[in-house]
Amino acid sequence: MNKKMFRYFCAILIFLFIINIGMISASEIDQSTDAFSNQILSDDSGVNEVLTDDPEGCSTETNPEDTEVQGETTDPTPNPNDSTDPNVEEHQEEVLEKTTLSSVDYVIKNKYLNVYLKDSSKNAIANQKVTLTINGKTLSAITNSNGIAKFNITNAAKTYPVTLNFEGDDKYASSSKTLNLRVIAKPIYTKMTIAQYGIFVGNYLNVYLKTTAGKAIANQTIKITINGKTYTRITKKNGLAKLKINLKSNIYSVSIKYAGKGNYIPVSKSIKVNVLSSKLIGKTNYGKVYFIGIIGNRSSNIKIAYVVGLHSMEHKIHDSLYKQMINKVNMKYKYYIYRIVLTNKKGSYSTLRMRGQMLAKNYIVPHAKNQNYDLVVDIHSTSGISYKQTYFIHVPKNQHEPSMKLAKKTIQLIKSIEGNSKILYWSPPTQTSPPYIHLPLIKAGTPTFVFETWSYEKKSQTDKRAKILIQAIDKVFD
């Protein structure tokens, strides 16, 4: 090869070598560009961000630490999402007053159902729209000043699912209520009767369910709530529902409810019952003495005792006062009863009297002396044969001023209660019982007097006089 050809050949090789190097460099540049593109991402705000391995990278933004607000320097463009920005008002959720809707679950056909709208403090909410949906139809009414929305129910007699609704407003929260509404075409009204309000431990609370016409309603469910527990009882043929009471002696609030069924209208009663204790303090082959209490105000500092049964033949006034007293709940003072019961009633009039007197002497007097009574009242009646007066109070032998004072004040109180009362203070010429009970108590410092009424008066008169005496005694220390 001559020199000229050799130079030409070398020039071609150099040219090819240069082209090859250029292609390799272009490839590397393309690869760097791709790698850089793959690191471009989007943040939540939709603005692309360049990521780099170098923390100081190639970002054109100033380091955040360098842009921190110093002193009084402020950012001229506040961030609308910054909750601390003073130019942005903080949103506070408004709290609405809670509301409730209520009504009974029955209505008489073509009569009004009252729906009550109240706030959380049980205050009536007036001038608000309430709706009632029954059998696919929605009725509306505006509450009156008592918070009552009245709905005239004309549906056929049966039970319907009903929805009550209040939509609420800018002050009151919405509320709704669903119930099964019993529409009654021919209502039968009912009533409850409580047999007694004084119940001895272990005895029964007796509740009678009857129509207002007096017909017993059998096989009905009665709910009785006492001392925080609710008991269900079914009425018997005579309408009686019974609940055995095994609570300690005290006064209890009782709620009794009958929800109604068929055409029977619901009825409820809230009462107080006094659970009593009865203690046997003396016993012989002819009689017993019971100590019964507490009756009335258990917190009172005034303690009073009645004595009944001293003379068994005078039982009418004994029975009347005893039954009335044990059923008393709301009284000012604290009361007890000593009850003498003869188990052997065979013998003469004087024999029976002496038995009662001996039971009083041997059991009542020793017990009563230790009780610090403010007053003891012995209950009697007279035939009017030996005594010319038949309605009176007296202190045996007129020997105790505190007893005399209380006796005379009781007479004044009876006269203030009973118009044209014939009661008076009178001391009988003959008295058989004082040595056995009254005089020993007076000697011990316990004020004592005797109440007498006529043995042959009508029962209604005896009951009336017992009632008035109880009322008067409950004011005697005022």
Identify the meaning behind each predicted range.
Residues 23-100, 104:
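Low-complexity, acidic Ser/Thr/Pro-rich repeat tracts that form intrinsically disordered stalk/linker regions
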Residues 119-138, 210-230:
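Short flexible loop/turn segments that cap and initiate beta-strands
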Residues 152-159, 244-251:
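Surface-exposed, short loops/turns at beta-strand junctions within beta-sandwich domains
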